[in-house]
Design a protein with these regions (language model features):
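Extracellular adhesion/carbohydrate-binding repeat motifs centered on closely spaced tryptophans
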Residues: 1-316
């Protein structure tokens, strides 16, 4: 009848509000649905007994087992035609987040979710969307989350001029994290760490940063500090003390590596770091030190140097 199609059973009775051959749907008027969403409850005659949202294309056929752009949003449909939602890992291993059961649109850009990260993401699991204080993910224009290829590795991406790192589950790195798989060149392992700010920051630190987050308190389960032995006179080192609990100045190069006291330091120049024409001393945990400090040579003699009156200075 015109542009509409109707289904008649063997007795000539027109079908209404039901699925036909698990492929088409006719509405209350009996007309075949096209270019529209259809909701079906559980235990209905829908192609999936779980119910959910289904989409009928321009020819009235239910969309199945594919991605489809609808009204400028990207949706995924399973083999039964049911719209996917929540977390989704597709056949090629790409990770997406599709909102709740009444949404389904693949997210793009930054998204903060209530996610503990202990067991990864289950397909169909819905996470609460937060304004902050949760776990941040970044989804590309095609909806794919940026994430590392394997466990205990990180993928990095420059976004709006800042470098971010993401683990195998797509979670943005925060705090002190070992992301580069570098060999340590110091007494504690600080040379393998970078700093990525608080829970709602994530930018890799460069230049000077005053931090209350101590690197010894890293949440990186795959990292542990070694004992600090650089003050041993037989190795050469600095005579100084540190009281925990306070903040400290750190300096990070363009690759995010903090300045630190190298175990190879055997001289005043080797034990300090030049920044903007001045020399500074950073201890085995990367903390800048100030005041009068003594460098202990391998032969036990001490060379003293003055590094400013307080922590706001530190220049030799």
């Amino acid at each position: 009848s015109g542009a509409n199609y109707y289904y008649l059973d063997s007795d000539g009775v027109m079908a209404r509000s039901q699925w036909i051959d698990d492929t088409y749907y006719v509405g209350s008027s009996g007309a075949r649905a096209s270019n529209r969403w259809v909701w079906a409850g559980e235990d209905s005659d829908a192609p999936s007994s779980d119910g959910g949202w289904f989409y009928l294309d321009a020819n009235g056929r239910m969309v199945t087992d594919t991605w489809r752009v609808i009204n400028d949003h990207r949706y995924h449909f399973d083999s039964d035609g049911r719209m996917s939602y929540g977390w989704l890992t597709d056949e090629d291993g790409s990770l997406y987040y599709l909102g709740d059961e009444n949404d389904g649109a693949a997210r793009t850009g930054w998204l903060c979710l209530d996610y503990d990260g202990e067991y990864g993401q289950e397909d169909g699991e819905v996470a609460a969307v937060l304004s902050g204080g949760g776990t941040w993910f970044y989804f590309q224009e095609n909806g794919r989350a940026i994430r590392a290829a394997g466990e205990n590795t990180y993928a990095n991406r420059t976004i709006n001029g800042y470098r971010y790192y993401f683990d195998e589950n797509g979670a943005m790195a925060t705090g002190w994290v070992s992301v580069g798989n570098r060999e340590a060149n110091d007494a504690t392992g600080i040379s393998t760490l970078e700093y990525f700010g608080g829970a709602d920051e994530g930018q890799m630190a460069r230049g000077w940063r005053y931090l209350y987050d101590d690197p010894e308190d890293t949440d990186d389960e795959d990292f542990s500090f070694g004992p600090a032995t650089s003050s041993d006179a037989s190795h050469g080192g600095w005579a100084h003390d540190y009281e925990g609990g306070d903040g400290a100045w750190y300096y990070f190069d363009n690759n995010g590596t903090p300045a630190y006291l190298s175990t190879a330091a055997q001289s005043l120049s080797g034990a300090t770091t030049r920044v903007d024409g001045h020399r500074y001393f950073f201890d085995e945990y990367g903390r800048m030190k100030s005041g009068l400090l003594g460098f202990v040579r391998a032969d036990g003699t001490v060379v003293s140097a003055y590094f400013g009156a307080d922590d706001s200075d530190g220049a030799m």
